[in-house]
Amino acid sequence: MNYHLGNLQDFNPNLCQQLKRYCYEINGCCQTVHKELGPFLNEYMYQDALEIIFNERAIPHTREYYFSVDFHGQQIRHKHFVDFHVREKIFIECKAVGSLGPEQRQQLWNYMRLTKVRIGILYNFAPIRDQSEHYYLDTDTNIMYFF
């Protein structure tokens, strides 16, 4: 499924500011991991370190949050998982790739759509300068906004 992508700042500046504040602490955790471990490591090492930071800061989370998918009224037998489900409201998908591309974005967007989780963070630890993208899904319209 393709998404209409919009800028949340243009659509709803107040919501955009709220979400940025809400994600600020999580971004700080990711930046700490990147700063201390550096670039070019395995994705799982970054996930392990991020989980340590979440635990140290008492940030509620689930690592490898599994979810089911319904298809034609039946539950598909195999489950997917997102790297982190934080505060029961935010999906974090961790990457360690040269650069974020459409495949990584589409993966996160599909997870958000299938579960109705409205906030998603795509974080790439591999480059020398880390990359972070934030998304908000309007579940009524299926419009994906970046912020």
What positions do the PLM features span?
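Nuclease catalytic cores
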Residues: 19-24, 39-43, 47, 51
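Conserved catalytic cores of phosphodiester-cleaving nucleases, focusing on short active-site segments
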Residues: 38, 82-98, 111
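Nucleic-acid nuclease catalytic cores
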Residues: 95-147
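Interdomain/boundary linker segments immediately adjacent to catalytic/signaling cores
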Residues: 1-37
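A short, glycine/Asx- and small/polar-enriched loop/turn
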Residues: 75-80
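A short acidic/basic microdomain associated with nuclease active sites
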Residues: 45, 55-73
